[in-house]
Amino acid sequence: MAAQGCAASRLLQLLLQLLLLLLLLAAGGARARWRGEGTSAHLRDIFLGRCAEYRALLSPEQRNKNCTAIWEAFKVALDKDPCSVLPSDYDLFINLSRHSIPRDKSLFWENSHLLVNSFADNTRRFMPLSDVLYGRVADFLSWCRQKNDSGLDYQSCPTSEDCENNPVDSFWKRASIQYSKDSSGVIHVMLNGSEPTGAYPIKGFFADYEIPNLQKEKITRIEIWVMHEIGGPNVESCGEGSMKVLEKRLKDMGFQYSCINDYRPVKLLQCVDHSTHPDCALKSAAAATQRKAPSLYTEQRAGLIIPLFLVLASRTQL
């Protein structure tokens, strides 16, 4: 009986261990499959809301965009395997949402997303990709279908590290190509000179999808702004490191270009939140004018005193 009891006890322990193993496997299966963020909550509502709001920014002849049709065209990618979505899957979406970009208003960027959005000021100053309709509806969002199901995956979505043809990267590739083709006049580019890997990513959306699709006959020149973060390192500036690669590439392509370190209007915007930082101690002509103002005022007063005495003297004689 004792032997039978021990055998039963060992069997129970084995069953418990097996159950624990099954639970661990189930928990592992529930973990995020992909490296990226899952589908944004309320994706459809956000998309349609942004689309409806953006139409007011368009010229009257372009405001007849059908947001529902644009969503349905976008949703085609949500019906595909999350590693089998191609840039061309967004062709209809782009065609339905595309509109003209004002001349001289295009603003390309790398590693400066928030600063670009702030400086563009909702299309008032510039119109970067995130401020055209097809970019606005997807900015800062994530989306994908579940791997083996038709529902959306709210837990994780693939990045380029998981697979090349993922929904989000393919979207921005297609959008970047269209944005480049529609840009004209003076092309502006904002790069991050504090980025550890260099201001100009040799492999990136700007290098791989935007520069190759610029329409040379529509472009006057390219103006590059290399911005440095307030208090951050000065890793690269114009003519240094990866910037030399970019400048040579543009020159070889026949583009006229210029490069400016810490473009003043953008620098002033950066300093709004860092007004007391040494990087924001601007030595401007205005400050020099203010310092000289008292002496100028004194000279003006002195110049007025002599005529005043003459007037008083003439009245006394009368």
Swiss-Prot record:
GO terms for molecular function: NAD+ nucleosidase activity, cyclic ADP-ribose generating; phosphorus-oxygen lyase activity; transferase activity. Residues 1-32 form the signal peptide. NAD(+) binds at residues 109, 172, 210. GO terms for cellular component: extracellular exosome; extracellular region; plasma membrane; side of membrane; specific granule membrane; uropod. Optimum pH is 6.5. Keywords: Cell membrane, Disulfide bond, Glycoprotein, GPI-anchor, Hydrolase, Lipoprotein, Membrane, NAD, Signal, Transferase. It is found in: Cell membrane. ADP-ribosyl cyclase and cADPR hydrolase activities are both activated by Zn(2+) or Mn(2+), and inhibited by Cu(2+), while Mg(2+) and Ca(2+) do not have any significant influence. Disulfide bonds join 51-67, 83-163, 144-157, 238-259, 271-280. Homodimer. Its EC number is 3.2.2.6. The lineage of its organism: Eukaryota, Metazoa, Chordata, Craniata, Vertebrata. SUPFAM superfamilies: N-(deoxy)ribosyltransferase-like. Glycans are attached at residues 66, 95, 148, 192. This is ADP-ribosyl cyclase/cyclic ADP-ribose hydrolase 2. It catalyses: NAD(+) + H2O = ADP-D-ribose + nicotinamide + H(+); NAD(+) = cyclic ADP-beta-D-ribose + nicotinamide + H(+); cyclic ADP-beta-D-ribose + H2O = ADP-D-ribose. Catalyzes both the synthesis of cyclic ADP-beta-D-ribose (cADPR) from NAD(+), and its hydrolysis to ADP-D-ribose (ADPR). Cyclic ADPR is known to serve as an endogenous second messenger that elicits calcium release from intracellular stores, and thus regulates the mobilization of intracellular calcium. May be involved in pre-B-cell growth. InterPro entries: ADP-ribosyl_cyclase. Residues 294-318 form a propeptide. It is a lipid-anchor; GPI-anchor. Expressed in various tissues including placenta, lung, liver and kidney. GO terms for biological process: humoral immune response; positive regulation of B cell proliferation; positive regulation of cell population proliferation; regulation of actin cytoskeleton organization; regulation of calcium-mediated signaling; regulation of cell-matrix adhesion; regulation of cellular extravasation; regulation of inflammatory response. The gene is BST1.
